[in-house]
Amino acid sequence: MTLSKEHKAAVITQFGGNDKNTGKTEVQVALFSRRITELTGHLQQHPKDKHSRRGLLMIVGKRKKALKYLQQVNIARYRQVLADLDLRK
C-alpha cells in the first residue's frame, strides 16, 4: 500500500523541482493525493478493512490542512496545485 521509491521520486521531482525537495507543501499534497488514490483502490477491494479506512481518513485530513495552509500563504501556488492534481474547484 505504500508508494514505491520510483513513484515517490517522480512525484517529488514533478512538484518539488528536484528529488531532495520533499518539504515543499506542493510535494506533500501530491504525495498525500497519490496515497489516497492507492488506499481508495484498496478499500474498494476490501470494504471491511477498518484500519485502512481510518488511515485514509487521517491522510485526507493531513492533505486538507496542507491545502488550507497553502491557500493562506500563496493563493497562486494553491490554485496551481489544485489544477495539476485535478482536485476540487
From Swiss-Prot:
Pfam families: Ribosomal_S15. CDD domains: Ribosomal_S15p_S13e. Part of the 30S ribosomal subunit. Forms a bridge to the 50S subunit in the 70S ribosome, contacting the 23S rRNA. SMART domains: Ribosomal_S15. GO terms for molecular function: rRNA binding; structural constituent of ribosome. Belongs to the universal ribosomal protein uS15 family. Keywords: Ribonucleoprotein, Ribosomal protein, RNA-binding, rRNA-binding. GO terms for biological process: translation. GO terms for cellular component: cytosolic small ribosomal subunit. One of the primary rRNA binding proteins, it binds directly to 16S rRNA where it helps nucleate assembly of the platform of the 30S subunit by binding and bridging several RNA helices of the 16S rRNA. This is Small ribosomal subunit protein uS15. It comes from Chlorobium luteolum (strain DSM 273 / BCRC 81028 / 2530). The keyword Ribosomal protein applies.
